[in-house]
Amino acid sequence: MFENLSDRLSKTLRNITGKGRLTEDNIKETLREVRMALLEADVALPVVREFIAKVKESALGEEVNKSLTPGQEFLKIVQRELEKAMGEANESLNLATQPPAVILMAGLQGAGKTTSVGKLAKFLRERHKKKVLVVSADVYRPAAIKQLETLAQSVGVDFFPSDVKQNPVDIAKSALADAKLKFYDVLIVDTAGRLHVDTEMMDEIKQVHAALNPIETLFTVDAMTGQDAANTAKAFNEALPLTGVILTKVDGDARGGAALSIRQITGKPIKFLGVGEKTEALEPFHPDRVASRILGMGDVLSLIEDLERSVDREKAEKMAQKFKKGDDFTLDDFREQLIEMKKMGGMMSMLEKLPGAKNLSEHVKNQVDDKMFVKMEAIINSMTLKERANPDIIKGSRRRRIALGSGTQVQDVNKLLKQFDEMQRMMKKMRKGGMAKMMRGMQGLMGGGLGGLGGLGGMFKR
């Protein structure tokens, strides 16, 4: 997320953090570099001008130079102003109304609006325990109705049927009546997208808005369109009262111009980030956490939240009890660990949220391939129950059969078994001898046995 901007800013700010005193002369070059980094990230010019002016004013203030580490204070100022540009605090959905709370979704074609409806429905059902109904009022694209129906089934929410022959306003009214009748907590209405903001589109959505009187009107924009995303949202907001923005395709946006421009140009908060194609890939937008990630400081809070949501407490407790009793760590246990890792978005997703992840060498980053976990799981799935319980019996012919069944090579099976053997030994060391032995075990595991994770052993040496 925002790799180019993050790399450029981290490199620029590293040069000033050691300064003993900040003067107009020694911050001039740094501010010029920051300005260039923001413009290259496609941040809107008025936003860049205001940002630079505020950073300069604060950096030359008396309090900063009274500090023992003015360079570090400068970094804090940049972080604070980044947060302010994006909205300072997380603004969650407002559902404080007589149920059903209606959420109207709008956006241009191809921005990921319908997918965002499915993600939002899943988010509300799983994290807020809401009974959700979704409906498509997009009568211009038959595939949109079918797409939303399929999404609704996959995320476990109800779908209100609609047809291309119906009027969008009639669809909206019927869905609202049904939501009231069946005591739904939330109704999410998907509307038609267009290639650009036009009068016909605005008139239609105004009518739908008037019929529903939604408590939330969210505009979905593609992060990769940069400041154009902010300008489109502004034009839309002038015709319809938006309450917030969902920024999609953030995982593919290396620049970050949209995230830094939207709040100041539209006056509306970013409420969610779409960070992938999967239905769980929707994150509440926290300006402070995003600013921290942009500056290479990681996002530990989000990582902890991911862990709390993804880890099955019951399974974790069983594993802990098994470990205490001294039972063997089996290949089935290993597979469970791989599944938990996948649920959290994979190793790379976790690494990106750790402080200092930006300083990892490209060699290490290239070694972390999340497809590797899929391959490892497939190999274990191709084993019989007996083989999983007794990996020592897996010799030549069995290894060839497992490789064939999992669509992998024999050397992949060999690597996995070697890695598993080292994990077993590490578990035994942990039972016998505490943290020092555990760290040495982990170093050995990550240094050689993990195949694709080879270079990560260096993390424990720094």
Curated annotation (Swiss-Prot):
GO terms for biological process: SRP-dependent cotranslational protein targeting to membrane. PROSITE patterns: SRP54 (PS00300). Belongs to the GTP-binding SRP family. SRP54 subfamily. GO terms for cellular component: signal recognition particle. The keyword RNA-binding applies. The gene is ffh. It is an enzyme of class 3 (hydrolase). This is Signal recognition particle protein. CDD domains: SRP_G. Composed of three domains: the N-terminal N domain, which is responsible for interactions with the ribosome, the central G domain, which binds GTP, and the C-terminal M domain, which binds the RNA and the signal sequence of the RNC.
